[in-house]
């Protein structure tokens, strides 16, 4: 038991920094997953369960199960307090499709028409029409790279992963269609975990959200023919934060000329849902 505990700690330390573990060259994982390595003492039953789990193939795990794990692991009396409820992918898609996927696809379709118009004028690769078409595509990729999705109560990260998947699907389609229009295919994608931001009050859920995004990103890349990234394998996900999304109220002073007497807003009080916060002068 003690030898296994020490062996696992040594493995996790190596995964954090990269290097040799016995005869094996372990990649540099980073990402904060092994920032603090504390392996608990393992009993015989723990070791048996660990061995059984290690014999399974986890490469195609459905990351949405982490939501169920999180909800079932909570004290039932605290679920409503935390607003913790597993939302199935079909329900999440009802938000993602009209808010993220469809608007981006519509923008891409308009841009693709412009690229096709320039393509018809291309005499040779590298001429001014080709360069103009390529620049349109690069500008589009920059837009996707800088696109951000925020879930201020992200739970175990199902929404974040499905939002990232939608972004990556749009980019993959863009690359495929751009290649059919004669543009050189880019070597890698610009979308990734940096596109999704999350806030979660529960520390366990916030960590699950990071794992969900990490695993989902790796699975998507492999399924679409891309190698997983190296140095590091995992991007740091500090933008999935463990804190309360409701920030503390900062007292404000109302300017008597900017608020009507019946607006309901008072200095030092939280404004209502339709009332502006008045900054201190």
Label each residue range with its predicted role.
Residues 143-150, 156-281:
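Class I S-adenosyl-L-methionine-dependent methyltransferase module
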Residues 1-166, 195, 199-205, 243-251:
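Preference for the N-terminal adenyl/adenosyl cofactor-binding alpha/beta module
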């Amino acid at each position: 038991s003690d030898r296994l505990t020490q062996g696992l700690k040594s493995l996790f330390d190596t995964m954090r920094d990269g290097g040799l573990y016995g005869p094996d060259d372990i990649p540099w994982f980073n990402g904060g997953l092994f920032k603090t390595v504390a392996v608990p003492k393992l009993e015989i039953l723990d070791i048996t369960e660990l061995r059984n789990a290690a014999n399974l193939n986890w490469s195609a795990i459905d990351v949405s199960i982490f939501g169920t794990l999180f909800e079932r692991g909570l004290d039932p009396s605290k679920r409503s307090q935390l607003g913790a409820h597993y939302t199935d992918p079909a329900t999440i898609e009802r938000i993602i499709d009209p808010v993220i996927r469809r608007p981006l696809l519509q923008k891409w379709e308009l841009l693709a028409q412009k690229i096709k118009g320039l393509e018809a004028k291309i005499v040779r690769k590298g001429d001014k029409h080709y360069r103009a078409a390529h620049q349109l595509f690069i500008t589009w990729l920059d837009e996707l790279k800088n696109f951000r999705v925020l879930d201020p109560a992200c739970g175990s990260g199902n929404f974040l992963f499905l939002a990232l998947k939608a972004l990556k699907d749009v980019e993959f389609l863009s690359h495929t269609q751009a290649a059919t229009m004669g543009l050189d295919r880019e070597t890698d994608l610009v979308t990734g975990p940096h596109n999704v931001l999350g806030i979660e009050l529960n520390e366990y859920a916030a960590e699950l959200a990071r794992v969900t995004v990490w695993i989902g990103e790796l699975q998507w890349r492999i399924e679409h023919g891309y190698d997983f990234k190296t140095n590091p394998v995992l991007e740091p996900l500090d933008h999935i934060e463990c804190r309360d999304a409701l920030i503390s109220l900062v007292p404000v002073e109302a300017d008597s000329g900017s608020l009507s007497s019946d607006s309901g807003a008072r200095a030092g009080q939280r404004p209502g849902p339709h009332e502006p916060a008045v900054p201190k002068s």
